[in-house]
Amino acid sequence: MVAVIIKGNEVAEKKRAQLKEKVVKLKEQGIVPGLAVILVGEDPASRSYVKGKEKGCEQVGIYSELIELPETITEERLLVEIDRLNGDDRINGILVQLPLPKHIEEKAIIERISPEKDVDGFHPISVGRMMTGQDTFLPCTPHGILELVKETNLDISGKHVVVIGRSNIVGKPVGQLFLNENATVTYCHSKTRNIKELSKLADILIVAVGRPKMVTADYIKEGAVVIDVGVNRLETGKLCGDVDFDNVLDVAGYITPVPKGVGPMTITMLLHNTVESAKRAGVVCQ
């Protein structure tokens, strides 16, 4: 058996085309979806991510506004900027690019964003709604992972999902999303004693730990869906995931590559949330 490769870039393009059609219809009603991105400092990786978000907005017709602030900005001044955007009817989504400088408390910044504009899905109210199965903005990477698994046409209900990783951004929320789909979910992390044995029980294995090629064929149940969230740069400069792709390819049923796997879906789900926020707000732009 050779695994089917789930091409996240192709799935993302298909979904962006659908979003573009939705944006056209909203604009016919006088509604223009708007996303504000706050970038603090000059971190090259953060700037690269922001450019990807701007490009995505342009692709589907979303108005985007980039607010660039110096690394020396105070937490109080940043909170004032968020308050301004909370009150701006042109803006349906607010995203603060993380990480922030050490003197700024990320928790305080995230909690200041209006839940109605929390298109990253990080606000505690958004998280609580997700946990209880209510309609809310889902966190972008976990939502993208769920959509990729749905592309396999696998019936998620009753399946065993194993998540390796417990970050607040990916690991914890992605398990909850699959629980909401009636899967049975097992979390593994650095203190789990028998990760390999547990992984081998997974119908769907999601790996998000930041360790290059950690997961090999002996972690994989034959025919399993393997979702690799990791992005690691080797000494050669080549990107690789947390899964040893070539080693696992002959055991898995489906697998995402790195790059062009989960990554393109993250920004696409951000665009999805921004469009949904605009629909809910229904504010006609003058």
From Swiss-Prot:
Which EC number(s) does UniProt give? 1.5.1.5, 3.5.4.9
Pfam hit, one: THF_DHG_CYH
Q: Which GO terms describe its cellular component?
A: cytosol
Q: Which GO terms describe its molecular function?
A: methenyltetrahydrofolate cyclohydrolase activity; methylenetetrahydrofolate dehydrogenase (NADP+) activity
Highest taxon of the lineage:
Bacteria
Please list the reactions this protein catalyses.
(6R)-5,10-methylene-5,6,7,8-tetrahydrofolate + NADP(+) = (6R)-5,10-methenyltetrahydrofolate + NADPH; (6R)-5,10-methenyltetrahydrofolate + H2O = (6R)-10-formyltetrahydrofolate + H(+)
UniProt keyword annotations, A-Z: Amino-acid biosynthesis, Histidine biosynthesis, Hydrolase, Methionine biosynthesis, Multifunctional enzyme, NADP, One-carbon metabolism, Oxidoreductase, Purine biosynthesis
Do you know which InterPro entries this protein is assigned to? Aminoacid_DH-like_N_sf, NAD(P)-bd_dom_sf, THF_DH/CycHdrlase, THF_DH/CycHdrlase_cat_dom, THF_DH/CycHdrlase_CS, THF_DH/CycHdrlase_NAD-bd_dom
The pathway where this protein functions is: One-carbon metabolism; tetrahydrofolate interconversion
Q: Where does NADP(+) bind?
A: G165, R166, S167, S190, V231
Subunit notes for this chain? Homodimer.
Question: What family does this chain come from, according to its entry?
Answer: Belongs to the tetrahydrofolate dehydrogenase/cyclohydrolase family.
Cited function:
Catalyzes the oxidation of 5,10-methylenetetrahydrofolate to 5,10-methenyltetrahydrofolate and then the hydrolysis of 5,10-methenyltetrahydrofolate to 10-formyltetrahydrofolate.
Protein name as annotated: Bifunctional protein FolD
